[in-house]
């Protein structure tokens, strides 16, 4: 397999799908030595042509996940890496933070994980916001925004995203691919990143240009997995800042709620954040977590369209 020149084989790999406004150069700033290789996979031809940084780069038009499929198949030898981080290009992070992501992933042998988001980030799920007092929280849901995947998990999923620009649906299944999924996925409060732009604006437009929707892509992808349920995020355990284990979604959720209330000083006035907060607390207190293994369907069955959305696709 051809490797893009400049990759150093550090056992950890970061691949970012990048455009004109990508923030990946900031990830290299500072004095900390990197424990990871970086490959910039450009979806924007002008950004690719204007990049004179000397960093390893690859051009591939398209969305995030179909582009990652091509990049990882054509420009990377995955057998050289234990973990691969696949962040969006609008995340602010430091070399030290990214080093810590890989350190925690390897320390806990996680199948999939993600950094928490700083409290001033744009976010989709409030449980991904950083919680003071935790090093990490074990969760049943990791976002597609910035997942870090163990090689075997990535290799298992990669063939299924060859035609998916958004990757919608991955976040519902990749925390349940192991024979034992308890504590196989986590969110790292000890390694937060800042999400600087409203969620999914560029990717949504790319998907719409193809005549589909992110929701349709998600249904198709989950249908190819033989799994159509929706995962409701719950953090069911954690490790606090003293290194002590916190067990159970109720105990974890109460600590999460107290952390946010202390940070905000009082319940938030923003109605959407207030709604998100109480939804999170309700799920933590009464929600359930399914640790059963999802078995992916053979790829030959991957062409089936979900009947419930076939008409929707025809009308878009």
Identify the role of each PLM range.
Residues 1-4, 10-33, 46-49:
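Short, well-formed alpha-helical segments that are part of the catalytic scaffolds
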Residues 13, 164, 168, 172-316:
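C-terminal catalytic/acceptor-binding lobe
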Residues 25-30, 71, 97-104:
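A short acidic, amphipathic alpha-helical/loop segment
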Residues 25-27, 36-82:
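Active-site-proximal specificity loops/subdomain of glycosyltransferases
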Residues 56-57, 130-133, 203-206:
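Short, hinge-like loop/turn segments at secondary-structure boundaries
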Residues 80-92:
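Short beta-strand-to-loop acidic/aromatic patch adjacent to the donor-nucleotide binding site
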Residues 94-180:
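Conserved catalytic core of nucleotide-sugar-dependent glycosyltransferases
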